[in-house]
Amino acid sequence: MSAVTLTPGRAALAQWRAIRDGAPLRLDPACRPGIARAAETVAAIVARGEPVYGINTGFGKLATVRIAPDDLATLQRNIVLSHAAGVGAPVPAGIVRLMMALKLASLAQGASGVRPETVALLDAMLARGVTPVVPGQGSVGASGDLAPLAHMTAAMIGVGECLDAGGARLPAAAALARADLAPLDLGPKEGLALLNGTQFSTALALAGLFGAEDLLRAGLVTGALSVDAARGSDTPFDPRIHALRRHRGQIDAADALRRLLAGSAIRASHLVGDERVQDPYCLRCQPQVMGAALDLLRQAGATLETEANGVSDNPLVFPETGEALSGGNFHAEPVAFAADMIALALCEIGSLAERRISLLVDPALSSGLPAFLTGRPGLNSGFMIPQVTAAALVSENKQRAYPASVDSIPTSANQEDHVSMAAHGARRLLAMAENAAAVLGIELLAAAQGCDFLAPLRSSEALERVRARLRAAVPRLDEDRYLHPELEAATALVRDGAVVAAAGLDLPGVDGR
């Protein structure tokens, strides 16, 4: 995998995806002078003795408490230890790695006041595969993602646990030593700078975005295959229809469906003499639904790309004037809104697919396919219960899609009286994506089975490649058998990108392609 050169303030979504996936990271050396200037500004503030939040005061509701010069290092260590109060299952290592890279990019912009050696340690941990163990719960998305980032920072000072480059879990101090790194002694403001920020929420939201983008593409493929299995029409995908409505996502989704179905002998077989006038919405309105989901993902992607390239620390250091200004960039409301948009898109991708599965198993709607896609209905139940499973998963996602950003609860003795819930809103996306992937896996199986009943007619070249890829892993269902491993196999083909890769077409995504 090619190395990513991280230029703070100018990183693209594709670079963040590569970092999440384990690409080697190189910090642009051009940022070093700015880091040093900001650190010198903090040192000057300490020398002057003027009260500045987080440098020589307490935190949160305790901001009015002045801290003696001899206690400044203890203050920074204490905030890390006291704030490392997360609970729950650890976050996947790839997301922690992404969080670390986001924090690195923020610190490297020279507005946080940390020393070059602090940035260098975080950079080295990424380079040498030292990944802190970070519990998934405990952030409300303001004042930043304090608890998760405290667990990251605790590892930097040799406290807590890490995964080493081989994935072994061990004490943080031992992991640092194994990587030939020394624990950090925090300087003024550094504990707060490392804890304050939206990097945990943003990492989770980016992971959710990437997963949703993959599933949207897979959903276009399985949706097109369902059109052929149900002997549906491609007329609703005519570009003239969508040009009149002007929504970019809808236009792109319709174009993708047309290309996926191009050359289908199944479609050609019922161009003449078919008395059906219009298909049900789950087939006919795919461009409108999937296109709207694509537009949501693109909007969320733009927000998250901006957030990933910003600085969400507090206070912020301005070396040109020697000031440290208190603000609220740690409030993750933009990330929370983006996560809510991604959740809506994931919910609808799965919901529309489940409706297509329901259509395929119902002989009253499937245009000649046998009940539950089995040759001997009654003796065999076929795809009866996979459709029920899809319905269950879609219903779970409907509950999870409720906006997290509208829920706020005051913290820190009411000093932090409005919070974003971005971390919770972004973390649920991982489970929602798993559910949606399973629904699409079931649709893949059902649509391929439906096409099997239409033999010797064949679908398009793109969709026949998809069917062949599936059949290499899962045979046709002729008689009832134990289905769980086959559902898992089909879901893996969706999740891992094999379905989209087999289609061999450039399908639309968040970057506008």
Curated annotation (Swiss-Prot):
Catalysed reaction, written as an equation: L-histidine = trans-urocanate + NH4(+)
GO BP terms in the entry: L-histidine catabolic process to glutamate and formamide; L-histidine catabolic process to glutamate and formate
PROSITE patterns the record matches: PAL_HISTIDASE (PS00488)
Subcellular location: Cytoplasm
Positions bearing the 5-imidazolinone (Ala-Gly) cross-link: A142-G144
E.C. number(s) listed in UniProt: 4.3.1.3
Pathway membership, UniProt: Amino-acid degradation; L-histidine degradation into L-glutamate; N-formimidoyl-L-glutamate from L-histidine: step 1/3
DNA repair in keyword set: no
Gene3D superfamilies cross-referenced by the UniProt entry: Fumarase/aspartase (Central domain), Fumarase/aspartase (N-terminal domain)
SUPFAM superfamilies assigned to the protein according to its UniProt record, in alphabetical order: L-aspartase-like
Positions where 2,3-didehydroalanine (Ser) occurs in the chain: S143
Keywords per UniProt: Cytoplasm, Histidine metabolism, Lyase
GO molecular function, one term: histidine ammonia-lyase activity
InterPro entries in the cross-refs: Aromatic_Lyase (IPR001106), Fumarase/histidase_N (IPR024083), HutH (IPR005921), L-Aspartase-like (IPR008948), Phe/His_NH3-lyase_AS (IPR022313)
Cellular component, GO annotation: cytoplasm
One Pfam match: Lyase_aromatic
Entry similarity comment: Belongs to the PAL/histidase family.
The name this protein goes by in its record: Histidine ammonia-lyase
Organism of origin: Methylobacterium sp. (strain 4-46)
High-level lineage: Bacteria, Pseudomonadati, Pseudomonadota, Alphaproteobacteria, Hyphomicrobiales
Gene for this chain: hutH
